[in-house]
Amino acid sequence: MLDLVAKKLFLTRGKGIHEDRLTSFEYALRDAGIAGTNLVLISSIFPPKAKLISRKEGLQQIKPGQILFTIYSKNQTNEPHRMCSASVGIAQPKDKDRYGYLSEYEAFGQTETQAGDYAEDIAAQMLASSLGIPFDVDKNWDEKRQQWKISGEIYKTQNITQQTRGDKDGKWTTVFAAAVLLV
């Protein structure tokens, strides 16, 4: 039986601009370094014992035509100057034998920090609930983060986000963020 549990993963992001919507997505994938691969979108689990490696190291381990399992976020606009973002949030448990969470989030009108924090918040909330850590969705991010720190169960949260404004001439603008799992 195939062991398809990822041992490593890396984060990447990109943006693309073109008159054609699909081509702008292709350019975003090129900017992210993974255009020459076949992406398979999967659900949002950070595998137990998986190691987060650098983008550079991850890109060195892939080859053209390879099937890549990814959790990704993509957002597109052809409205001039419209702010758009795509983000993937990560929440890792302290116990490396447990799985963590990855979350996808797209937004219009948010800064890179706002979108990234929200994606991170989603992943952390999913992890907290799976670990039985109580949380109040109405608390602000800093209060929730403090609650999770006190529990001692959540090791690390982070995100990768690509944010830009729509092309001034109305060309399609795509933003893309991904966690790429390497099996």
From Swiss-Prot:
Cleavage (non-hydrolytic), annotated site positions: S43, S44
Cofactor: binding comment: Binds 1 pyruvoyl group covalently per subunit.
Alphabetized Pfam families for the sequence: PvlArgDC
Catalytic activity as recorded in UniProt: L-arginine + H(+) = agmatine + CO2
EC number: 4.1.1.19
Keyword Cell membrane: no
Biological processes per GO annotation: arginine catabolic process
Domain of life: Archaea
Protein family according to the UniProt entry: Belongs to the PdaD family.
Protein name: Pyruvoyl-dependent arginine decarboxylase
Name of the gene: pdaD
